[in-house]
Curated annotation (Swiss-Prot):
GO terms for molecular function: nuclease activity. Could be a nuclease involved in processing of the 5'-end of pre-16S rRNA. InterPro entries: RNaseH-like_sf, YqgF, YqgF/RNaseH-like_dom, YqgF/RNaseH-like_dom_sf. The keyword Nuclease applies. PANTHER family: POLYNUCLEOTIDYL TRANSFERASE, RIBONUCLEASE H-LIKE SUPERFAMILY PROTEIN. It holds the Pfam family RuvX. Its main location: cytoplasm. It is found in: Cytoplasm. Keywords: Cytoplasm, Hydrolase, Nuclease, Ribosome biogenesis. GO terms for biological process: rRNA 5'-end processing. The keyword Protein transport does not apply. Disulfide bonds: none annotated. This is Putative pre-16S rRNA nuclease.
Amino acid sequence: MLKPMALITPITAMAFDYGTRRVGVAVGNSVTKAGEPLKTIAAPNSDTLFKDIEQLLAEWQPNQLVVGHPTHPDGAPHEMTAKAIRFGNQLHGRFQLPVAWVDERYTSAVLEGDAQMRDNLDAHSATLILEQYFSELDTNLNTKAAD
């Protein structure tokens, strides 16, 4: 069965690994299903952070934003959960782009063991978040196509 056109329209997504001191950013598209780490923003305040993000959005023109949803290993929320949700809501409010949430448990832990990743850990974490989003999107599209 062919998928309807709406289901195969390419998505350019920008993902964020939110932290109170640094925010990792990655970009990718649904055609390659791969993400590319862009940068880690070390912003002293939210004005600086959102100005940097605005520049990245202007450059890459994503039509979807993805934010990592941090929780404890058992899925329970912790102190960063509400902060990440607030950040995602601010992204949506400021830039009028849809925001998707992706479980980010273990993304940093997976990368911390890789010495090459440590220098830009947050941006690489955002890449994993983005690739997880594409994987989940693919799974959802395949499920809908089978219905």
